[in-house]
Amino acid sequence: MTRDGKPCNVGQTPTKALGVTDQHSQLQLYTEGPYDKVITLIKVGAFRSTVEIPHGCEEFHDVAFLGGKTLNQLIEAERQGTEYALLKAGRMSQTITLPCVNAGTIGQLMYFFELTTAYEGELLNIDAFNQPGVETSKRATYAILGNTDAKYDAARKEMTGRPAFKPEYIL
């Protein structure tokens, strides 16, 4: 809800994707699904270590070319390939380059996303620091776990009074 009490059905939904692991489940959606996302790619300037991909699969043409390369190169090539696929599909993306991965750079990245969330809240006229939609779940969780504080009584009563699950609809 906006500060004026009007529905606001837009905003960020952070999701993570790990290279090729998530390409089939997410990249297809991002390139051919609804045009309602901005993708942020994270690039690492210097990895802590280098892992070489060994030779030894020459009989398998589809992977033989990887021998002698590093996992670092593979990760960066996957990022570039994803960036290219998004560009070719006309989808917005941004790349944030971390000089290295450590507590400091991860903290800076998290702070950056916190600031962008607060800024987006202002642009959409919503209070990014008040999440009433989350409170319902928290009250229900505390009630389920047996918190006897009176402020959870309503949630407990409402939940115990709801219709029973129908076994024929449960897989």
Task: List each model region and its residues.
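A SIS-like phosphosugar-recognition module
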Residues: 1-171
